[in-house]
Regions:
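Short, charged N-terminal beta->alpha structural module
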Residues: 43-77
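Bacterial N-terminal signal peptides that target proteins for export
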Residues: 1-9
Length: 156
């Protein structure tokens, strides 16, 4: 009987201490609680053609691929038509200032053009007024993914 009392008392004290620790916010350290551990993922992976050649642009492309999109890259907007002839794309990403060349290249395609405007040049406002969806060149990967997801979802 003597042996059971200290064991029970120890169990009660341990449960009280553990309960207090969780109440103080330590629950954030439990896996899956409070902190996101997984990488961004594309719920609707799409086929994307992107005009990109700088290191920053190619880094964004890598992140879109890591999220699950199938991305093809061309260095110049004049190469879009050739790529569209070989593959079917859902979305074309290119700078807003290249919109006339992109429009000429995508005329016979079902691919949706999402312009990427340069920040602080006035392009952002113009692109937002002219297109249903647009991006800024320094938007986060999360913003790119959300915009692409909304475009793919709208297409059905």
């Amino acid at each position: 009987m003597k042996l059971k009392t200290p064991a029970i008392l120890s169990g009660v004290i341990l449960s009280l201490v553990a309960g207090s620790a969780l109440a103080c916010g330590e629950s954030l350290f439990r896996v899956g609680k409070g902190v996101a551990f997984r990488q961004y993922t594309a719920p609707l992976p799409g086929s994307i053609l992107a005009v990109a050649k700088t290191e920053a642009e190619l880094l964004m492309i890598e992140q879109l691929v890591a999220a699950g999109h199938d991305v093809h890259v061309v260095a110049e907007p004049s190469q879009i038509r050739d790529e569209l002839g070989e593959h079917e794309f859902d979305i074309v990403l290119a700078y807003y200032r290249q919109r006339d060349v992109v429009a000429a290249q995508t005329r016979e395609s079902r691919a949706l053009y999402i312009p990427v405007a340069m920040r602080d040049t006035g392009e952002e406002r113009e692109a937002a007024d002219r297109y249903e969806r647009s991006l800024a060149s320094d938007d986060s990967v999360k913003t790119f993914l959300k915009t692409i997801h909304r475009a793919l979802k709208a297409r059905g």
